[in-house]
Amino acid sequence: MIIGGVPYYMDRFRPDRTMADNVNTIYFGKDRARQEFKDVYAGLYSTSDVYIKVIRQLVKYFYGMSRSQLLKALEKEGGGNFSEVLENLIDSGIIRSYTLYGGKRKQTIYQLMDFFSLFYLRFCENPEYTSWRSVQRSRPFYTWAGNTFELLVLEHMPQITDALRIKEYSTPFSWSGETPGGEGAQIDLVIPATAERADYICEIKFSEGKYVLKEEDADDITRHIEALRNSSVHKPTHSVYVALVTTFGMTESKHRSHINDLVTLDSLFS
């Protein structure tokens, strides 16, 4: 999740060195990552400054920003040039655009997807972090790990749907709304399975071991189901299933019945 499996960066990993040694060499050695970050964008775009400004803004908001939010934050006026910047970043795979459904409206959100940029901007520019070990010992590490695992899942939708035995599906989406009682609900990923006539709520959880489904998780799942069932994006004739997508599986607990399907890291790379 540090480099996203890009062959260029993978080739720089030495098999005779530990993970920590490799990360230290690539990211924390002699300003190498800083120069690499500049070179990546300079190599892709002739006017790289504006692209880097967009990336630096998006890294502040993991779930992304709308076009109007970006323009306001960057103090720019809308127009063809800015649209071209966003389109070029999407075409290169550095960002993605997705539809966020909420209430009765939907909006296009732009989200940073480049693993190298996410790690570099989060840790390498901060003097507090001088090595991979210092990163791993920090609280922001777990936030970053959870976020990038979610991106990893989004990049492997065919494998996710195969693991869930979904034959046909329409465009997956994120959703936010409320239960009939007014409780807020934010769902990371909904997969509308057309052939199965069902909506799959995917709860994406990073864990360094088997995930332990806690009572608050079970409460969240119940709220998510209730909110989605009462939303305009859900068809009343469709069922709602919950899939836990996590790294190494889950432990048995009294809340296990809240999960219909389990997808692990192995499924993403099988």
Give the predicted meaning of each segment.
Residues 8-9, 13-15, 19-187:
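Accessory nucleic acid-recognition modules appended to NTPase machines
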Residues 7, 102-103, 117, 206-208, ...:
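Conserved nucleotide-binding/hydrolysis micro-motifs of P-loop NTPases
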Residues 207-227:
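Mg2+/Mn2+-dependent nuclease catalytic core
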Residues 3-5:
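Non-catalytic terminal regions with compositionally biased, polar/charged low complexity
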Residues 223-238:
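Arginine/glycine-rich "motif VI" loop of SF2 helicases in the C-terminal RecA-like domain
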